[in-house]
Structures are given as C-alpha cells and as structure tokens.
Amino acid sequence: MTKEEFNVFCQSLPHTTHVVQWGGAGVWKIGGKVFAISGWAEEEPAFTFKTSDIAYEMLQEEPGLRPAPYLASRGMKWIQHYAKPGLSDAGLKLYLKESYRIVSLGLTKKKQSELGLNQD
C-alpha cells in the first residue's frame, strides 16, 4: 500500500480528520483521538495502528511488523507495518478498520453520539 492509498482509505472512514505532526507524520483521528499514523520510514512507507491485546501478541513477531516505536514502549498496543512482507493491502485495511473501531469505542458516549458512532 502506498501512502496515498493509506490516506484515501483512512479518509473513507466516517468522521476522520487528518493532521501532520510529530516531525511530518500523517496522523489520522476519530473524535480527536489517533487511530492511524503514516510516516517515519525513509525507504518504504510505515503505517502504525492500534490493536487488540491478542492481535498485538500475534503481529509483533511477524516479518515486516514490529511494536510501534514510541507508542509500544509506553505500554500501548500499537503495531507498525514498516517493511515487506508485512501485511497485504487487504490485511492492513482490516487492521486499520479495527483500530478505528477500538479508538471510537474509547470516546465518551457523548462524543460517540455526536458522531453517530457505535449506536448498535
């Protein structure tokens, strides 16, 4: 996945916003909370996303994936896709959607309601 494809996908998720911060990283948010980050790799795009505890344990040892620099060292369950083989584009999209879901569930009930999220 290219950085442009990553951005198009993240933008397609409801109510997302994009900012550039942390030394030029592209940061995607839902309700003001980060769910995905692009950048930080010179040779290839690097994509960072939040995971469940189980997914974190499974993914951290896979080739092309690692605990996300800065975030995982603080005890947060974030994975960075930084090299091939990593995840397929379809696999990365699934994890990005799951990151979006996890982060949206952490928003206040008021914010979720304002955004029309998690109303099931």
Task: Give a label for each model feature.
Residues 1-120:
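Charge-dense, helix-prone N-terminal extensions
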